[in-house]
Every structure is written in C-alpha cells, then in structure tokens.
C-alpha cells in the first residue's frame, strides 16, 4: 500500500518480529530547523487567502437529487466567506528518507506550560518534534523499524495511567501496532492480530487504555493496552466489505463511526451492556492467574449503516457533537446525521435507512484517497490539505451551517499532496505533512 492514491492499494506483507530501536538525535544549533529556512521573500508569500466561489465538482450523492430515504437540509452548500482565523507559514523541513509522511499528531495530553510535541509517521520511521517560539521545530527522537519494508500510516497519543508517561501508538502496512514510550525511548509493547495493513489508530477520549485500530482486513479491533487484551472485533456478517480506512469515537466514547473502501459508514455502540461487561472483564483479566485466554467479543452487526452519503472510498470520518463529518475522493467534506433531523441518535435503530445531509465543505484538487482532515481540540476549526499543497481552514463556530467561512493557506514551495494536518491543543500551531516528506508549520496570528 505504498501508493496511496486513486488506484487500490497493493497487498502489504503482514507479520511480527523486529525490534524497533530508538535513535536519539542530537543536532547542533546550526542543524536545527529554524525560521531561517524560509527567506523573507518566501515568508511574504506564505499567506492566508480568502476563498472565493466554491469550485463545482462532479455529481456525487451530496449534490444529486435526493436518493430514497435521504433528506436534504437547506441547499446543502457551504459557502466560503472570510474566516476569522489567519495563519502564517513560519517554518518547513524535510525528512531525509524522502518518502510520503502519512500521519501527524500533536500530543494533546501534555500539561499547560509543557513543550508542544508532535509525531510524524512515514516510511519505516517515527519521528518526534518539539515546537518552540519564533517558529523553531526541534528534532527530539527518531525511531526506525527493523523491517525496511514497514510503512507507517498512522499514529495516536495516549498516556500511561500508572506513571502518566506519554505513549505513542503507531501502525502501518505490516499490521503490527507498536507502543512507544518516549521517556524511556523504547518500544514497550506490540500487538499482532489484524490480518493486513492498519489504516488508523484512535484512543478512547475518556479511557487512555482503550485503543481502536481499523484495517485492510475489513475489521476494527478494540484493545486494552494496560492488560494487553483484545476486547472486541467489529466486522463479519454485516461489517465492512472492503478496507476500513478511518474511524472515530464520539466525545463521550460511547459510539464509534467507521468508514471504508466499500463507500459505507457504520455506527458501533460500545456503551451496550455486552460491551461494558467486555471492557470490565478486560481490566480484570490476569494471564498469570488463569490458563484460559481472554475471550474477545465478535460484533458482527453495526447499530446503523449507510452508503447514501458518498459514491467512492470514504477515507476520513469524525464526530462533531451528534453530527458526522466524512469525506471521500469527491472534493467535499459532508456534514450529516443518521436518521431524520429530529431523531435522537441514541435511539436510532439498525434498520434505519434515512440520513439527513446538513451541508458540505467544498474544496478543489483533492480526488486521491487517504487524505485526512482534522479539527482542533475545541472543534472550532477544521483543516484539510489537497494534492497540490493547499491548506483549507474552516471556522466551525457558526449558527448557520450554510455560512461556513474558509481560509486557504498557500506557500510557493509547498506543492506536494498534504496527507494529514494537526493542531496544537491551544490551536496556536497547525502542522501539515506531505508526500515529499516535508513538514510545514503554520502559526495562528492573534
């Protein structure tokens, strides 16, 4: 799956093995990345641009006449007006492997006053950086997988519930989840279970030990990293029929929405009596006190499913309150909810066939797959990069969804596909990572 574009991914090798040594990099001050990497002229060109009229796009489910059971909300067009958020490009650097960087995540678990740390993943490399004032990006640590064929696609931060140490989970083409402790600079655990590549990792918003992974093997898995147990597998009879590309917990961690190459989005409840008991039992399980293996739950039936939102691979999904934001390779992020507008999402039945589309965030030149959007911690901003290096930032603090405001961020030297973006917890910094192994830092102007 090295080529993540319009063509379906090639088969990836799976299997365990290989230690993952840490490489502590010490850079001299002149080697450190600093704002001097961008000349004054380039800095002048790195600006926030007000978006004009939205680019029209090909027919998709979001702008064709309503399909049966689909309700449209208003005109369904999110017009771009001047966004109140402005950013300036203050730094960029390029990792030496030259391969696409597929993932980036700031550590949102740090305390106030702690350095702003983010991780990038690409090739067989995991790299940690620290953001300093005046635009500096300082290299902290770099980890290399022993297998040169590993290609990391995704990462997620959590913390050790006993020591409060930050922990970073990473996974990719080989289907192995690795847990890295940056304090001890070691890969402390690894999990093998998925039969193929892992496309996304997510930690539960209220339980730092519950890790969700989604895979090319058509399934989602929920792990307890404190007791090293596989709590549940979501998939099978009514599960995804192709690669699962993305998933997200809702704010309370009671529901999961997943999406994939089968064009579908599926809702899985983890606050059912069955799942609550399974999670409780995963904490009580001690392999030293029993010979029996932990029994993982097999969840074959989602609590809601639809294919009425997109007509192509659905490669990113996020909860926004009780609403869903999802995108495909169709130049639009769609805002929608299961059922009718007045329906309570917690009472939606698996047989429900209605969906309500509230609107769209339109953009252009983003019709390859595995391009993921992000929101800031408070869900006030939404950011997405396209395949020619443009960044779109929308203001989500709006009453009328049809008046979404957008800023386009461009730099003359940022021309490669932006695979993922990440905001610092205080929303002061936006990092974008690209197909040419470049990292771009945009600082918010107050």
From Swiss-Prot:
<feature type="repeat" description="WD 4">
    <location>
        <begin position="239"/>
        <end position="280"/>
    </location>
</feature>
<feature type="repeat" description="WD 6">
    <location>
        <begin position="364"/>
        <end position="404"/>
    </location>
</feature>
<comment type="subunit">
    <text>Component of the PRC2/EED-EZH2 complex.</text>
</comment>
<feature type="compositionally biased region" description="Polar residues">
    <location>
        <begin position="50"/>
        <end position="66"/>
    </location>
</feature>
<comment type="similarity">
    <text>Belongs to the WD repeat ESC family.</text>
</comment>
<dbReference type="InterPro" id="IPR019775">
    <property type="entry name" value="WD40_repeat_CS"/>
</dbReference>
<keyword id="KW-0678">Repressor</keyword>
<dbReference type="InterPro" id="IPR015943">
    <property type="entry name" value="WD40/YVTN_repeat-like_dom_sf"/>
</dbReference>
<dbReference type="InterPro" id="IPR051243">
    <property type="entry name" value="PcG_WD-repeat"/>
</dbReference>
<keyword id="KW-0853">WD repeat</keyword>
<keyword id="KW-0156">Chromatin regulator</keyword>
<dbReference type="GO" id="GO:0000122">
    <property type="term" value="P:negative regulation of transcription by RNA polymerase II"/>
</dbReference>
<feature type="region of interest" description="Disordered">
    <location>
        <begin position="1"/>
        <end position="77"/>
    </location>
</feature>
<comment type="function">
    <text>Polycomb group (PcG) protein. Component of the PRC2/EED-EZH2 complex, which methylates 'Lys-9' and 'Lys-27' of histone H3, leading to transcriptional repression of the affected target gene.</text>
</comment>
<feature type="repeat" description="WD 2">
    <location>
        <begin position="147"/>
        <end position="190"/>
    </location>
</feature>
<dbReference type="InterPro" id="IPR001680">
    <property type="entry name" value="WD40_rpt"/>
</dbReference>
<keyword id="KW-0677">Repeat</keyword>
<keyword id="KW-0804">Transcription</keyword>
<feature type="repeat" description="WD 5">
    <location>
        <begin position="309"/>
        <end position="346"/>
    </location>
</feature>
<dbReference type="Pfam" id="PF00400">
    <property type="entry name" value="WD40"/>
</dbReference>
<dbReference type="InterPro" id="IPR036322">
    <property type="entry name" value="WD40_repeat_dom_sf"/>
</dbReference>
<dbReference type="GO" id="GO:0031507">
    <property type="term" value="P:heterochromatin formation"/>
</dbReference>
<dbReference type="GO" id="GO:0035098">
    <property type="term" value="C:ESC/E(Z) complex"/>
</dbReference>
<feature type="repeat" description="WD 1">
    <location>
        <begin position="96"/>
        <end position="139"/>
    </location>
</feature>
<feature type="repeat" description="WD 7">
    <location>
        <begin position="413"/>
        <end position="446"/>
    </location>
</feature>
<feature type="repeat" description="WD 3">
    <location>
        <begin position="193"/>
        <end position="233"/>
    </location>
</feature>
<keyword id="KW-0539">Nucleus</keyword>
<keyword id="KW-0805">Transcription regulation</keyword>
<protein>
    <recommendedName>
        <fullName>Polycomb protein EED</fullName>
    </recommendedName>
</protein>
């Amino acid at each position: 799956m090295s080529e993540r574009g319009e063509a379906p991914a090639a088969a990836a090798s799976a299997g365990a093995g290989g230690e993952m040594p840490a490489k502590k990099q010490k850079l001299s001050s002149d080697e450190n990345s600093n704002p001097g990497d961008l000349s004054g002229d380039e800095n002048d060109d790195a600006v926030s641009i007000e978006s004009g009229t939205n680019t029209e796009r090909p027919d998709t489910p979001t702008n064709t006449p309503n399909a049966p059971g689909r309700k449209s909300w208003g005109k369904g067009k999110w017009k771009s007006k001047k966004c109140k958020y402005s950013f300036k490009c203050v730094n960029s650097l390029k990792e030496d492997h030259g391969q696409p960087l597929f993932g980036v995540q700031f550590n949102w678990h740090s305390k106030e006053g702690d350095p702003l740390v983010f991780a990038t993943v690409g090739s067989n490399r995991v790299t940690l950086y620290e953001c300093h004032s005046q635009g500096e990006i300082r290299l902290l640590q770099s980890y290399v997988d022993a297998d040169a064929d590993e290609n990391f696609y995704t990462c997620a931060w959590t913390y050790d519930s006993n020591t409060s140490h930050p922990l970073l989970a990473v996974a990719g083409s080989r289907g192995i989840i690795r847990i890295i402790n940056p304090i001890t600079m070691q890969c402390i655990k690894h999990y093998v279970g998925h039969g193929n590549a892992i496309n996304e990792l997510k930690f539960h918003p209220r339980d730092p030990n519950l890790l969700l992974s989604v895979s090319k093997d058509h399934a989602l898995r929920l792990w307890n990293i404190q007791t090293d147990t596989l709590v549940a597998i979501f998939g099978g009879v009514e599960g995804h029929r192709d690669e699962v590309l993305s998933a997200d917990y809702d704010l309370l961690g009671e529901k999961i929405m997943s999406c994939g190459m089968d064009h579908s989005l599926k809702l899985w409840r983890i606050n059912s009596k069955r799942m609550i008991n399974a999670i409780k039992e995963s904490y009580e399980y001690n392999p030293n006190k029993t010979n029996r293996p932990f029994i993982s739950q097999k969840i074959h039936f989602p609590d809601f499913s639809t294919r009425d939102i997109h007509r192509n691979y659905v490669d990113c999904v996020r909860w926004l309150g009780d609403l869903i934001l999802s995108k495909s390779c169709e130049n639009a992020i769609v805002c929608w909810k299961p059922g009718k507008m007045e329906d309570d999402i917690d009472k939606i039945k698996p047989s429900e066939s209605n969906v309500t589309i509230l609107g769209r965030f339109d953009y252009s030149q983003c019709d390859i797959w595995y391009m993921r959007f992000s929101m800031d911690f408070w869900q006030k901003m939404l950011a997405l990069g396209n395949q020619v290096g443009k960044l779109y930032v929308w203001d989500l603090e709006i009453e009328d969804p049809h008046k979404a405001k957008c800023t386009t961020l461009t730099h003359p030297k940022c021309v490669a596909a932006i695979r993922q973006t990440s905001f610092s917890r205080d929303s002061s910094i936006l990092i974008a990572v690209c197909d040419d192994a470049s990292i771009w830092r945009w600082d918010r102007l107050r």
